[in-house]
UniProtKB/Swiss-Prot annotation:
Residues 43-56 have a biased composition (Basic and acidic residues). A motif (EAR-like (transcriptional repression)) lies at residues 12-16. The gene is IAA3. It is found in: Nucleus. It comes from the Eukaryota. This is Auxin-responsive protein IAA3. Changing G67E: In shy2-3; gain of function. Affects auxin-related developmental processes. Affects photomorphogenesis. One of its GO terms (cellular component) is nucleus. Its main location: nucleus. Residues 92-179 form the PB1 domain.
Length: 189
């Protein structure tokens, strides 16, 4: 039985070597709260008193910083106000326009135009080409380029195949392609 008397010396524990489990309250506070902050003696005494009471109440929560960094909330509010303004003023319908052989894209607002004729004139001026005339049966004649658009389903169609209001609702982007590539899009092209 004497063999088991000296168990304290060989016991494994989480404390530092050479220290006993029983610490004074002040030492316990300084050991546990090692967060490199200066502590006033009055604060240490209050912590000791509150830990000795061991009440069932939870400690007060820290105030949560909401919306940090403030730039993000500023941007969010700014974007929301711009969205509300655009809804009231009438929303623009912007689509990208590309032309085969042109190294750049353009973006236009379809709501600025009242019909296909105005749109085609604007495209001719923008990309410096001529469209020719559109015939219901033959498509576009008299030009090497054919104006097409991609609808919401992802299909490429000739500009002028559907009524203008339907075109505005379904158009995702415009492409002025070469007539040789546009075979099969229209009736006779």
């Amino acid at each position: 039985m004497d063999e088991f008397v000296n168990l304290k010396e060989t016991e494994l524990r989480l404390g530092l070597p050479g220290t006993d489990n029983v610490c004074e309250a002040k030492e316990r506070v300084s050991c546990c709260n090692n967060n490199n902050k200066r502590v006033l003696s009055t604060d240490t005494e209050k912590e000791i008193e509150s830990s000795s009471r061991k009440t069932e109440t939870s400690p007060p929560r820290k105030a949560q910083i909401v919306g940090w960094p403030p730039v993000r909330s500023y941007r969010k509010n700014n974007i929301q106000s711009k969205k509300n303004e655009s809804e009231h003023e009438g929303q623009g319908i912007y689509v990208k326009v590309s032309m085969d052989g042109a190294p750049y894209l353009r973006k236009i607002d379809l709501s600025c135009y009242k019909g296909y004729s105005e749109l085609l004139k604007a495209l001719e001026v923008m990309f410096k080409f001529s469209v020719g005339e559109y015939f219901e049966r033959d498509g576009y004649k008299g030009s090497d380029f054919v104006p097409t658009y991609e609808d919401k389903d992802g299909d490429w169609m000739l500009i002028g195949d559907v009524p203008w209001e339907m075109f505005i609702c379904t158009c995702k982007r415009l492409r002025i392609m070469k007539g040789s590539e546009a075979k099969g899009l229209g009736c006779g092209v």
